[in-house]
């Protein structure tokens, strides 16, 4: 992931990732655009052009909800695709089903197709029913196998199987994405510890380690999902 407030810093991260063997770059919106950047499409285009000029790697645009102040307007994304051909996909977190479907229908039908990768992990089955090209989800660190099963079931229109898999995903989605939302990755780390995939769940301040009662609830969600006895 290329996460930086300034374009020069983003270029440095992109070059470092490329030198270390990255296959693609997920470009986060810079926080410096949060106070009205939607009104300056030239800023977003310039940001992507600088990164694209620094590396030959394919780029994935990370689309945030409009409510965050960091989401790109629809027309701005079309401009980015037209002017920066190394942008090959978006990680779609618009969190608006109507807009999400518009992204899928429009971007995946462009002369130069731009794939939509859903990260609507709290309502993934509904999202996958719209047939995005794939998904890119933090929860995949814990439930990648279930997400792949759900994706494949929706691709072949096997609704019964999709519902069955989604019933297993549901308790963990509810546990991961409840308020406060900022603890979602802390919760995933604790689940990885419970599953024996991590030795410990390290938290970077100002985030704080979860209370024991919440870790117990995460264990219960893992049991409900059939991932732990």
Regions found by a protein language model. Name each.
Residues 139, 143-229:
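C-terminal alpha-helical cap/extension of soluble enzyme domains
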Residues 15-24, 76-87, 193-195:
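Short, electropositive alpha-helical surface patch
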Residues 1-71, 208:
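Active-site beta->alpha loop and helix N-cap motifs at the rims of alpha/beta catalytic domains
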